[in-house]
Protein backbone atom coordinates (compact mmCIF):
# COMPACT_ATOMS: atom_id res chain seq x y z
CA UNK A 1 0.00 0.00 0.00
CA UNK A 2 1.20 3.49 -0.85
CA UNK A 3 2.29 5.68 2.06
CA UNK A 4 0.83 9.12 2.61
CA UNK A 5 4.24 10.64 1.86
CA UNK A 6 4.45 8.77 -1.46
CA UNK A 7 0.96 9.94 -2.44
CA UNK A 8 1.92 13.51 -1.52
CA UNK A 9 5.09 13.22 -3.62
CA UNK A 10 3.06 12.16 -6.66
CA UNK A 11 0.64 15.03 -6.11
CA UNK A 12 3.47 17.56 -5.75
CA UNK A 13 4.99 16.31 -9.02
CA UNK A 14 1.62 16.87 -10.69
CA UNK A 15 1.26 20.42 -9.36
CA UNK A 16 4.85 21.20 -10.38
CA UNK A 17 3.97 20.40 -13.98
CA UNK A 18 0.74 22.40 -13.74
CA UNK A 19 -1.60 19.40 -13.63
CA UNK A 20 -4.07 20.60 -11.03
CA UNK A 21 -6.62 17.88 -11.86
CA UNK A 22 -4.10 15.09 -11.26
CA UNK A 23 -3.09 16.72 -7.96
CA UNK A 24 -6.72 16.55 -6.84
CA UNK A 25 -7.32 13.00 -8.01
CA UNK A 26 -4.15 11.72 -6.34
CA UNK A 27 -4.39 13.56 -3.03
CA UNK A 28 -7.77 15.09 -2.19
CA UNK A 29 -10.92 13.38 -0.99
CA UNK A 30 -14.18 14.43 -2.63
CA UNK A 31 -15.24 16.30 0.52
CA UNK A 32 -11.88 17.84 1.48
CA UNK A 33 -11.90 21.10 3.45
CA UNK A 34 -8.95 23.39 2.65
CA UNK A 35 -8.24 26.27 5.05
CA UNK A 36 -6.38 29.17 3.38
CA UNK A 37 -5.16 31.84 5.85
CA UNK A 38 -4.61 35.54 5.58
CA UNK A 39 -6.42 38.61 4.32
CA UNK A 40 -6.14 38.15 0.56
CA UNK A 41 -9.04 37.72 -1.81
CA UNK A 42 -8.71 33.93 -1.52
CA UNK A 43 -8.55 33.63 2.29
CA UNK A 44 -11.15 31.28 3.72
CA UNK A 45 -12.41 27.70 3.62
CA UNK A 46 -12.78 25.69 0.45
CA UNK A 47 -15.19 22.78 0.77
CA UNK A 48 -15.00 19.92 -1.69
CA UNK A 49 -12.40 18.85 -4.22
CA UNK A 50 -13.78 21.12 -6.96
CA UNK A 51 -13.52 24.21 -4.75
CA UNK A 52 -9.97 23.30 -3.68
CA UNK A 53 -8.93 22.74 -7.29
CA UNK A 54 -10.39 26.09 -8.29
CA UNK A 55 -8.18 27.70 -5.62
CA UNK A 56 -5.09 26.00 -7.08
CA UNK A 57 -6.12 26.74 -10.67
CA UNK A 58 -6.47 30.39 -9.68
CA UNK A 59 -2.84 30.45 -8.55
CA UNK A 60 -1.72 29.02 -11.88
CA UNK A 61 -3.79 31.59 -13.77
CA UNK A 62 -2.49 34.43 -11.57
CA UNK A 63 1.12 33.44 -12.18
CA UNK A 64 0.57 32.39 -15.80
CA UNK A 65 2.25 29.09 -15.01
CA UNK A 66 5.20 30.68 -13.21
CA UNK A 67 4.50 28.91 -9.93
CA UNK A 68 7.23 26.57 -8.70
CA UNK A 69 7.12 24.28 -5.68
CA UNK A 70 9.96 22.33 -4.11
CA UNK A 71 9.40 19.89 -1.28
CA UNK A 72 11.77 20.56 1.63
CA UNK A 73 10.61 18.08 4.25
CA UNK A 74 7.69 15.77 4.96
CA UNK A 75 6.76 14.46 8.40
CA UNK A 76 4.30 11.58 8.47
CA UNK A 77 2.20 10.41 11.39
CA UNK A 78 -0.66 7.94 11.69
CA UNK A 79 -3.40 10.20 10.28
CA UNK A 80 -1.50 13.41 9.55
CA UNK A 81 1.28 14.67 7.31
CA UNK A 82 3.15 17.95 7.66
CA UNK A 83 4.85 19.18 4.50
CA UNK A 84 7.28 22.09 4.17
CA UNK A 85 7.53 23.50 0.66
CA UNK A 86 9.60 26.27 -0.93
CA UNK A 87 7.27 28.24 -3.20
CA UNK A 88 8.36 30.79 -5.78
CA UNK A 89 6.11 32.61 -8.21
CA UNK A 90 6.12 35.60 -10.52
CA UNK A 91 3.40 37.89 -11.83
CA UNK A 92 3.52 41.35 -13.42
CA UNK A 93 7.16 41.88 -12.46
CA UNK A 94 6.59 40.89 -8.82
CA UNK A 95 8.06 37.85 -7.12
CA UNK A 96 7.02 35.65 -4.25
CA UNK A 97 9.55 33.53 -2.37
CA UNK A 98 8.20 31.83 0.76
CA UNK A 99 8.16 28.59 2.68
CA UNK A 100 4.71 27.06 3.07
CA UNK A 101 3.77 24.59 5.79
CA UNK A 102 0.85 22.34 4.92
CA UNK A 103 -0.80 20.21 7.58
CA UNK A 104 -3.00 17.45 6.20
CA UNK A 105 -5.40 15.03 7.87
CA UNK A 106 -5.84 11.84 5.86
CA UNK A 107 -8.92 9.65 5.77
CA UNK A 108 -9.24 5.88 5.61
CA UNK A 109 -9.08 5.96 1.79
CA UNK A 110 -5.58 7.48 1.92
CA UNK A 111 -6.69 10.90 0.69
CA UNK A 112 -6.65 14.27 2.44
CA UNK A 113 -9.88 15.17 4.23
CA UNK A 114 -8.66 18.42 5.78
CA UNK A 115 -5.84 20.71 4.67
CA UNK A 116 -4.35 23.73 6.47
CA UNK A 117 -1.85 26.00 4.69
CA UNK A 118 0.48 28.38 6.54
CA UNK A 119 3.31 30.61 5.34
CA UNK A 120 6.48 31.98 6.88
CA UNK A 121 5.44 35.38 5.44
CA UNK A 122 1.65 35.60 5.15
CA UNK A 123 1.80 39.34 4.48
CA UNK A 124 3.92 38.70 1.37
CA UNK A 125 1.51 35.99 0.20
CA UNK A 126 -1.50 38.25 0.74
CA UNK A 127 0.16 41.13 -1.10
CA UNK A 128 1.13 38.89 -4.01
CA UNK A 129 -2.36 37.40 -4.38
CA UNK A 130 -4.21 40.64 -3.79
Model-derived features with residue positions:
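Short acidic-aromatic low-complexity motifs
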Residues: 1-31, 62
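Coil-to-beta-strand transition motifs
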Residues: 78-82, 95, 105-113
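Short beta-strand segments enriched in hydrophobic/aromatic residues
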Residues: 28, 87-89, 119
Amino acid sequence: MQTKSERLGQAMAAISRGDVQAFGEILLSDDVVWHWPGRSSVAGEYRGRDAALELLSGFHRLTQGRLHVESLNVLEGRDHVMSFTHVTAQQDGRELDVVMADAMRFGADGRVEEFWTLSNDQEAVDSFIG
